[in-house]
Amino acid sequence: PMRERLFPRWCTALFALLPMSELLYLPADGQSVYAAALACTVCALAGIGAARLSDRVRHSAPAQWVLALTSLFPLLASIARMSIFLQKTVFTGRSCGSTVVLLTVCILLMASMGLNRCAMWALPIAWLAGTVLLLSGVLTLTQLTPASFSAPTAALLPQFRHILYSLLPASVVLAFSLPETRLSASVSRGLSAGGALLALLLLRTVLLLGANTAALLPYPAFTAAGLAAIGNFARHGEVFFAVPLLLCEIGRCAALVCVLLYPFTRTCGVLHLRRPQ
């Protein structure tokens, strides 16, 4: 049925969530933009290759178990960093354990729809996040200081490795798990679009806060978003900025849970997808 088909635009949106999920946590300095752009390019190329092999992987039980085990690492890393972020910024009075439980419940509820419908919901989430991020950038455009811009140097390599370590496993695991090899172009488009937005917002952070100040902050992009406001309506611009990005990461985690459970359920979801009679 149509609802169980993974359309290319849904796939594009799902993979666009992956780079955008990184924005809240990345350090920002003069080399961040180049490191992010390079890492997302590598992930897009790796994702194309993985998607083209997805048909073989789907019919191999050992490969499915390897994917399931591999998906655990980016999944647990995402839940941990979301919990720490929320505890330090929003839920300062709550324990980290309660935040982990709350996030896990949200992720499992979304994963219960199955991978295809997770990708379907990724489309409005990606549009919401993209719109909010671009609006945040536009509102701070007049406050940017181009003097903070710097040319690429070898100092970008540590950040490149850091972003690649965080982004590549989820990108490759999800690309290998796609139901059709023809979706490889959607993988590339999604990672490229999300990567471009990630690089632009990191650039905005550096030009707005200055490279030295941004490098000292634990969540520089979140702090920079707090300077975007529309009168009294959005005085806490960082909240409007963070919510869609957290939704991006919950969507990413839900898709990884679908991959994790596939060897047990033989469907890409917690609940068995209905089949035509």
Could you say what each language-model-derived stretch is?
Residues 7, 73-83, 127-152, 205-206:
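Hydrophobic alpha-helical segments and their helix-loop junctions in multi-pass secondary transporters
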Residues 29-30, 53-55, 84-88, 104-125, ...:
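Membrane-water interface regions at transmembrane-helix termini and the short interhelical loops
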Residues 54-93, 112, 245-268:
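Hydrophobic transmembrane alpha-helices that form the core helical bundles
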Residues 24-31, 82-91, 143-155:
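Membrane-interface helix termini and inter-helical loops of multi-pass transporters
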Residues 6-24, 36-47, 67-71, 75-78, ...:
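Hydrophobic, membrane-embedded alpha-helices of multi-pass small-molecule transporters
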Residues 208-238:
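Membrane-interface interhelical connector segments
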Residues 55-62, 115-121, 179-190, 265-273:
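Membrane-interface helix-boundary motifs at transmembrane edges
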Residues 29-30, 58-59, 151-153, 228-237:
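Helix-boundary and loop/linker segments of multi-pass membrane transporters
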